[in-house]
Amino acid sequence: MTKPPLTLYLAAPRGFCAGVDRAIKIVELALDKWGAPVYVRHEIVHNKFVVDGLRAKGAIFVEELSECPDDRPVIFSAHGVPKSVPTAAQARNLVYVDATCPLVSKVHIEAQRHADNGLQMIMIGHAGHPETVGTMGQLPEGEVLLVETPEDVATVKVRDPAKLAYVTQTTLSVDDTADVVHALQQRFPLIVGPHKEDICYATTNRQEAVKAMAPKCDAMLVVGAPNSSNSRRLVEVGARAGCQYAQLVQRATDIDWRALDGISSIGITAGASAPEVLINEVIAAFDAHYDVTQEVVETAVENVEFKVPRVLREPA
């Protein structure tokens, strides 16, 4: 039986970003240096395949520092942690390595700087996401106000409208965030923003690639985890950019082939914490069902690399 033809558009950039790559390397190098087990507070990155792979090598994932023993190293996830976490680790004399993405750390420093200058902080982010919790936890409880939507901006209660600054989560929708920033600037004309956009280069680049790809596609799949903020945003961006069917899949086994019946083109991308092996698995699944012609939609070239902490570059 002849397979139906399918044009498969592959977004570039896609998949791993520099912060995720660094965080995974940190866990692997810590296991090399100190042996198993190494404890990791929260999933190092939001991807089950990656976490399961590290668990098999001897990483133990916990949600709280209190679950870590005193005599084993602990790593903080790429999303960042409240200031209270390293303080508690120091009080227990724990060996710890902070795998917070440097671009998240930049937001932490920004929030602290604005607070030191007497400005009240507003954070644009998703409630409960570990990155939001970590950034808000850089300052005393109640000092950072959280807004998610322009509607939230209308009701937020501030101390002094003339003394405000905002930061954002790094993995948000660029367009949605622009709407929230606009609402903040309309209501609080004196609000201070970041010197450089807080939404990171990788989030922005992956969304731009999807915007370029989506209008060409009958359907689009984003390889990523349901708890990955940046992956979920890619699905939303694809739908908004005109793709009729945009769906999140963790692996090829999640593909709903019935929903794709009759398509002649598909777009494939992946969130920043999804490894290339899972993307290749999805492409192989389409190769098995269709006569595939592959086209790359490239909107940016990435060559960012972040060094791992010095403690892991030194011999044991």
Curated annotation (Swiss-Prot):
Q: Which residues bind isopentenyl diphosphate?
A: 46, 79, 129, 228-230, 273
Which free-text remark accompanies the cofactor?
Binds 1 [4Fe-4S] cluster per subunit.
At the top of the EC hierarchy, this enzyme's class is oxidoreductase
- The catalytic residues are 131
Q: Does the keyword Metal-binding apply?
A: yes
User: What are the boundaries of the signal sequence?
Assistant: none
One Gene Ontology term of the biological-process aspect is: dimethylallyl diphosphate biosynthetic process
The UniProt entry, under Pfam families, shows: LYTB
Any idea which UniProt keywords this protein has? 4Fe-4S, Iron, Iron-sulfur, Isoprene biosynthesis, Metal-binding, Oxidoreductase
Record's superkingdom? Answer: Bacteria
Binding site residues for dimethylallyl diphosphate: 46, 79, 129, 228-230, 273
Q: What is this protein for, i.e. what is its function?
A: Catalyzes the conversion of 1-hydroxy-2-methyl-2-(E)-butenyl 4-diphosphate (HMBPP) into a mixture of isopentenyl diphosphate (IPP) and dimethylallyl diphosphate (DMAPP). Acts in the terminal step of the DOXP/MEP pathway for isoprenoid precursor biosynthesis.
Record-stated family? Belongs to the IspH family.
Q: What is this protein called?
A: 4-hydroxy-3-methylbut-2-enyl diphosphate reductase
Identify the species of origin. Roseobacter denitrificans (strain ATCC 33942 / OCh 114) (Erythrobacter sp. (strain OCh 114))
